[in-house]
Amino acid sequence: MALLKVKFNQKKRVKLAQGLWLMNWFSVFAGIIVFSMGLFLKIELRKRSEVMDNSESHFVPNSLILMGILSCAFNGFAGKICYDSLDPAKFAKWKPLLKPYLALCFFFNILLFFVALICFLMRGSLESTLAQGLKNSMKFYRDTDTPGRCFMKKTIDMLQIEFKCCGNNGFKDWFEIQWISNRYLDFSSKEVKDRIKSNVDGRYLVDGVPFSCCNPSSPRPCIQYQVTNNSAHYSYDYQTEELNLWGRGCREALLHYYSSMMSSMGAVVLLVWLFEMSVMVGLRLLHTSLESIANPEDPECESEGWILENSLKDTLKSALESLKKIGKFNQVEAGAEGAEGEEAGKTPAITTVS
């Protein structure tokens, strides 16, 4: 029994073809939106590439760009088929291509669905990329005189100001690295010497943070040095008082920014996928309704359209049998080639009589 069998007359077939033509051009527009989202996400990720550990995060935007291009190509082609299906003479040239095209559409929709899922599932990978990337970037904050790293101070400062964050996981991350360049340290000072000697790696560590960690909304002037020294500041207790530094780490801030963006994009891609599935189903109904016309010379006659010629169970069974036959045929061919090779390798023995 056919799955989703529908009866069509000429009027219904024309309406279906016209509706599908319109839907395909809407799908082309949806493909442009998916392409644009991928391009936008790629640009946003490139802006912060210095604070990311690897290029794996670009898999999502690259996938969106590819799906957008394929969507425009497939739906533009389908729109042409639907337009020509109103004319039997024009439709005849497309008829042999419809089955392979529908198979390609099916695989395209599977890929589109997986891309939508990846948009929701990339959070874990993105988190580890940001955590390691920010950690490495903060180490280079002081290298303002080193070629290739001189821009890192500005990058980190602008990042902390824009996203209202401080450090990787919090402001205390700055206590663990030397973020002040040796160029600006007075090595004749006893305090500087003592701090460097007290550190195993010979680094100048302070309980201070860069100016970009300061919250301008705080009524108190920014305390960015001796943050944990209560006696260094009047009426101050860093453990109980709300600090005038950003409390959120930049990893969390960036992760929230990109995750919310990708989740929104994933929702849009899912909607596009549902629309693409409805277009594919409609195109299959149009294809089968035109193929099942009893008398091609009488376009007014009724016909039947369906999604699957047999039930889902029977279709899967026949598909598995076809795959088994292909596998057996390949084995037989391989065996025949092997036998031919063995025969060719045998050379006839020639006996000479003296």
Curated annotation (Swiss-Prot):
Segments in the Lumenal topological domain: 44-61, 124-264
Keywords associated with the record: Cell adhesion, Disulfide bond, Glycoprotein, Membrane, Transmembrane, Transmembrane helix
Subcellular location: Membrane
Any one GO molecular function term: protein homodimerization activity
Membrane topology label: Multi-pass membrane protein
Any one Gene Ontology BP term: protein heterooligomerization
Transmembrane segments: 25-43, 62-80, 100-123, 265-290
Keyword check for Transferase: no
Domain of life: Eukaryota
Cellular component, GO annotation: photoreceptor outer segment; plasma membrane
Residues glycosylated per entry: 229
Keyword hit for DNA repair: no
Region called Disordered, residue ranges: 335-354
Annotated signal sequence range: none
Cytoplasmic topological domain residue ranges: 1-24, 81-99, 291-354
PANTHER family: PERIPHERIN-2, TETRASPANIN
UniProt record similarity statement: Belongs to the PRPH2/ROM1 family.
Subunit structure: Homodimer; disulfide-linked.
Function noted in UniProt: May be involved in the morphogenesis of retina outer segment disks and the development and maintenance of the retina ultrastructure.
Record protein name field: Peripherin-2
Native species: Gallus gallus (Chicken)
